[in-house]
């Protein structure tokens, strides 16, 4: 008699736990598992999970009940884009998608891009850069931690007057590097491509820092590390902030966005 009663009570307890877990799953399941979730949110979670295995979940109270977001999706609602870690093709795809999405919502409201990156693939960084120049929104860049290599280029590419750094960040610029193997002709082709990218990057830095090409070439010949104040003097950023700016302090200058291109060789003289 007693074993049967205890077994029945255990089954009731198990059923109750299952029901409780089901209700919790409905309320607190991450939004990227929902059928109606957007591809952007699934992409955001997938890339963020590879970079950061533990993603905080934010639960909001709405008129329809509770809604859960991963922290990066919640920041995206506030028009904040995070560029964290090495810049590769997957990170570039994620950042570009967010920029285009925010422009589709409003092409006048500023976008805040927080950068903490050691750099990465040049072509991936240039894809983000071109998108920043392509969209109409003013882009406010923030350096937190470090902005090295391609990270410093993205920092400098923000809208004039809206490029910031926190006081203990580090900024580093240098020329592109790479390697090649194979036949001598293939190596020569790769070396020529790196030289073209080098000139292209010099032009971009010169455009956004207002420095001459000679100064840029000299500064980027080797790794050059800068404090935020030194980077401000160099022209990579505009302000070093300890506290968030007050309302109205970050009005961008209305300038025409132009894409910097690599210099072209002058045409060879023709003989007559």
From Swiss-Prot:
CDD domains hit by this protein: S14_ClpP_2
Disruption phenotype: Homozygous pups are born at about 60 % of the expected Mendelian rate, indicating decreased intrauterine survival. Mutant mice are smaller in size than wild-type littermates, show decreased motor activity, are completely deaf after 12 months and their lifespan is decreased relative to that of wild-type littermates. Both female and male mutant mice are completely infertile due to defects in germ cell development.
Residue range of the transit peptide in the UniProt record, numbered on this chain: 1-52
Tissues in which the UniProt entry reports expression: Detected in liver (at protein level). High levels found in heart, liver and skeletal muscle.
GO cellular component: endopeptidase Clp complex; mitochondrial matrix; mitochondrion
Keyword Protease: yes
Location of region: Disordered: 240-272
Main location: mitochondrion
Catalytic residues as annotated in Swiss-Prot or TrEMBL: 149 (nucleophile), 174
UniProt enzyme class: hydrolase
Protein family membership: Belongs to the peptidase S14 family.
HAMAP family: ClpP (MF_00444)
The protein's name: ATP-dependent Clp protease proteolytic subunit, mitochondrial
Native organism: Mus musculus (Mouse)
Lineage: Eukaryota, Metazoa, Chordata, Craniata, Vertebrata
Gene name in the database record: Clpp
